[in-house]
């Protein structure tokens, strides 16, 4: 829109007030409606001589409803005019609505408060009549009377059962001497305070009646449910309008004969019961009509509120017309500025006073905005170009990059940092880095007080049970301001450190194996030659001679096996894989360890067969190392807390993997630096070589599997899990079909011989290695 078009659209003249067409009619209607609303409120509150009867309430409701309709028509006409003006593009329509809304809010709040106060006053008055305490009193009075009657019913039940038992024993008297029987019946009735006692038949005819002189004769009711009575369960009869309670029970050993008794109830209690029941019925009837009264008053309050609200809206509509003429031009110009047209100018009329100054200020503002927009657009293009370049660099680097503000809160987190820390950007943003990664607190504090621009160091993080070592560098952002941020970079050097340690220890192992292995063969050959050449010539202490030579040979073998471990770790042979049965390997290994450690209970749960491709010798070595470590860990537990040593070996197939779990109740694994136990020469035992788990880990890695170190699920101990690829179709985990507890499984003679040798070696060495 050009400036000329804007001036033409904005200079259409002021809006004329609607009062010119209505004259004094509209203000008079508003005034009368407000007077009617006030009078209605005073009548309802009881502040006038007029009693708010049903007829009065209906009358004032109709009068106020008519006032609401007239006011609605007047307000609707004004709103229609505003809508018509808005359709023509006049911005003043919005201002009209806002001013009307302001008037409505200002008026509706006190109207609502008055309605709420009146409603609360009415509710408080009704609540005093229908409070829970009043309801409880009325209901309790009925309950007390009914409880009294029920108590009589329970008492008469016990009396009739006792009396029935006594009369059953008197059957012979009944058949031989009816006169004496009647005397006994009368005495029984008098003794139990039963003024009515008689023997009746099923057809309700009376056979015998007790002669209790009370001046009243009891009649058997025709609706007595005599057929429902049993010898152990009498029928209790409570007539509605009578002043007694009765009961009937069949007599055992009597032919079609029933005992019917009755006891009087205090007639005042019966009268009270009827009175309380009638009172309760009247009370509930009043309570049912309570809602109607509340609805009528609520409608009246709503009508009063509508009158006040509509009157305020009408006043707001007319008052706003005198304000919108000078403001309309500013609003229209502001709309053009919002659409991006900063060349618009508002005409200035000095007669408008302060609004003219506002228009002049508006024109200055648009001029400044136009200049600043051009500068901002230029700077935005430069910043956007740098942002895209920075995002591309951060997303492509392998190191984790974290940006911090002056309060050490995270502002930037690239994908590598999310992956290394196991956090999402949503979880980490705007949180303190020391809170997200507490291990960096020391470096952050050092960087804050350091003179150099960057500080670096290594930290160890444990996430999901895994320890990782990171090289961390904290760099201070250069800024002329006193407050500045930091850039933190993280590099995962765990594998690098592990590879360096493994390489260094492999070289050490190779040298140790070379230096120790050379003298072993001559020592062993010399001991065997001594035994073979001089054994038959030794006649004295021959047993000691054989024991010494055997010990030398066995110890040389132990040292040789230790050297073999060094050599195996230094030069681990490539596995020669072929199809094998893992279940058979586990059973044989468990059998050997069970014989070598009879003090430990070995539980094995393995399927009948688990085919896989692996090197039989290497996997057997790995299982033996794990089981030996478990047994020695149990031996390391102090005897007073050890209890029964137990090792559980289970295996099953999960998907495409074979999973072998070894759980013991030994000393367990350390919580800190647990993953370092898989590195060479890292051990928690004084005499341990630190190669057992390292060799196991290497064997599993060569087979495409892995090893996990966990705590035992129950109590103390360790849980080692070995995984390697299975052979054959994928299967779900199967229940173990082989389970042994302490007893040895059948094995070949060669296996038994190996087991005996292993047991002897274990007893001789007495090693205590746990890695």
Swiss-Prot record:
Domain of life: Bacteria
UniProt domain HAMP: residue ranges: 321-374
Enzyme kind, highest EC tier: transferase
MF annotations from Gene Ontology: ATP binding; phosphorelay sensor kinase activity
Keyword terms, alphabetized: ATP-binding, Cell membrane, Kinase, Membrane, Nitrogen fixation, Nucleotide-binding, Phosphoprotein, Transferase, Transmembrane, Transmembrane helix, Two-component regulatory system
EC number: 2.7.13.3
Residue stretches of biased makeup (Low complexity): 740-763
Disordered: region residues: 727-771
Kinase is among the record's keywords: yes
Modified residues (Phosphohistidine): 514
Keyword Isomerase: no
Membrane topology of this protein: Multi-pass membrane protein
Matching Pfam families: HAMP, HATPase_c, HisKA, NtrY_N, PAS
PAS domain mapped to chain residues: 386-458
Domain (Histidine kinase): residue spans on this chain: 511-728
Gene Ontology annotations for the cellular component aspect, listed alphabetically: plasma membrane
GO BP, sorted A to Z: nitrogen fixation; regulation of DNA-templated transcription
Sequence intervals crossing the membrane: 22-46, 56-76, 99-122, 295-319
Annotated compartments: Cell membrane
Catalytic reaction(s) noted: ATP + protein L-histidine = ADP + protein N-phospho-L-histidine
InterPro entries: HAMP_dom, HATPase_C_sf, His_kinase_dom, HisK_dim/P_dom, HisK_dim/P_sf, NtrY, NtrY-like_N, PAS
Function noted in UniProt: Member of the two-component regulatory system NtrY/NtrX involved in nitrogen level control. Probably activates NtrX by phosphorylation.
Name of protein: Nitrogen regulation protein NtrY
Species for this entry: Azorhizobium caulinodans (strain ATCC 43989 / DSM 5975 / JCM 20966 / LMG 6465 / NBRC 14845 / NCIMB 13405 / ORS 571)
Gene name for this UniProt entry: ntrY
